[in-house]
């Protein structure tokens, strides 16, 4: 259900603004989007896994909060994030 360290490093590398950037909202949203996608695939075969569903809702909520922060700071960055990660809003 969680992403591997290699996949996480790859996601960080493709979304980082500079080397060593792991805390920017763009990187955090990318990591959360990857984890959400993995959980969504998990639920296709384990539809009654309500314990993991609660975790999914928490991840979505955290991503939503980060996106709201980015939208408040810079609308263009927000739109780019939505487009890049195919997030509906």
From Swiss-Prot:
HAMAP family: Ribosomal_uS15_B. It comes from Afipia carboxidovorans (strain ATCC 49405 / DSM 1227 / KCTC 32145 / OM5). Disulfide bonds: none annotated. Part of the 30S ribosomal subunit. Forms a bridge to the 50S subunit in the 70S ribosome, contacting the 23S rRNA. Residues 1-11 have a biased composition (Basic and acidic residues). This is Small ribosomal subunit protein uS15. One of the primary rRNA binding proteins, it binds directly to 16S rRNA where it helps nucleate assembly of the platform of the 30S subunit by binding and bridging several RNA helices of the 16S rRNA. InterPro entries: Ribosomal_uS15, Ribosomal_uS15_bac-type, uS15_NS1_RNA-bd_sf. GO terms for biological process: translation. It comes from the Bacteria. Residues 1-24 are annotated as: Disordered. Keywords: Ribonucleoprotein, Ribosomal protein, RNA-binding, rRNA-binding. GO terms for cellular component: cytosolic small ribosomal subunit. Gene3D superfamilies: 6.10.250.3130, S15/NS1, RNA-binding. Belongs to the universal ribosomal protein uS15 family. GO terms for molecular function: rRNA binding; structural constituent of ribosome. SUPFAM superfamilies: S15/NS1 RNA-binding domain (SSF47060). It holds the Pfam family Ribosomal_S15.
């Amino acid at each position: 259900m969680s992403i591997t360290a290699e996949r996480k490093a790859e996601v960080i590398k493709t979304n980082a603004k500079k080397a060593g950037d792991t805390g920017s909202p763009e990187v955090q949203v990318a990591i959360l989007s990857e984890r959400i996608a993995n959980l969504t695939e998990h639920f296709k075969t384990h539809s009654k896994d309500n314990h993991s569903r609660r975790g999914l809702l928490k991840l979505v909520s955290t991503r939503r909060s980060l996106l709201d922060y980015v939208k408040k700071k810079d609308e263009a960055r927000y739109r780019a994030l939505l487009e890049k990660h195919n997030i509906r809003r």
